[in-house]
């Protein structure tokens, strides 16, 4: 509401006791936006008493809205200020790095062919054959080549009804059919233990021959003449 003094200063009143010209009616939308709407003014043209009451009601509604918005902003600020860095850390989930399993890789020697045979693995610079029976790993033997270890595994695989690496001959199949599993293991261990001393003896003989000096050809011819 504009005071009488302000209206006189603005030129709305004529003389000291002039008639106060009524202000034009403004709807709530016009009061908020500040843009006059001629359609709304033509549709609604109330009397002076109704105009005053509607303006008061609309002014109260605007004040109520502004008060609610201020209270919401104050409530939001208070809630935001109450959150400390410790609380924010406790609210946010703790970062846990993904667990990675260790990959056990076998050491490979230079110029070593990979283990492509079933039941064969490389350990202690030698090829070893093994088979798993009833959740137990049974060591069959140690060999210098991968093929020898695979051949022994094939015999054990035939006894257990598994797929071999190579095709077995009829003679070997006939021999294995006459043995039980325990007899096969005992026979295999016996052959491995019998092979060990021979290989050691041959290795020692080669060492002795290499250490002995060779006689020259002239001495050999003289000995033949005598």
Curated annotation (Swiss-Prot):
The keyword DNA-binding applies. Residues 63-109, 195-226 are annotated as: Disordered. It is found in: Nucleus. It comes from the Eukaryota. GO terms for biological process: ethylene-activated signaling pathway. Keywords: Activator, DNA-binding, Ethylene signaling pathway, Nucleus, Transcription, Transcription regulation. GO terms for molecular function: DNA binding; DNA-binding transcription factor activity. Residues 97-109 have a biased composition (Basic residues). Residues 105-171 bind DNA. One of its GO terms (cellular component) is nucleus. The keyword Transcription regulation applies. InterPro entries: AP2/ERF_dom (IPR001471), AP2/ERF_dom_sf (IPR036955), DNA-bd_dom_sf (IPR016177). Its main location: nucleus. Residues 217-226 have a biased composition (Acidic residues). PROSITE patterns: AP2_ERF. Probably acts as a transcriptional activator. Binds to the GCC-box pathogenesis-related promoter element. May be involved in the regulation of gene expression by stress factors and by components of stress signal transduction pathways. Belongs to the AP2/ERF transcription factor family. This is Ethylene-responsive transcription factor-like protein At4g13040. It comes from Arabidopsis thaliana (Mouse-ear cress). The lineage of its organism: Eukaryota, Viridiplantae, Streptophyta, Embryophyta, Tracheophyta.
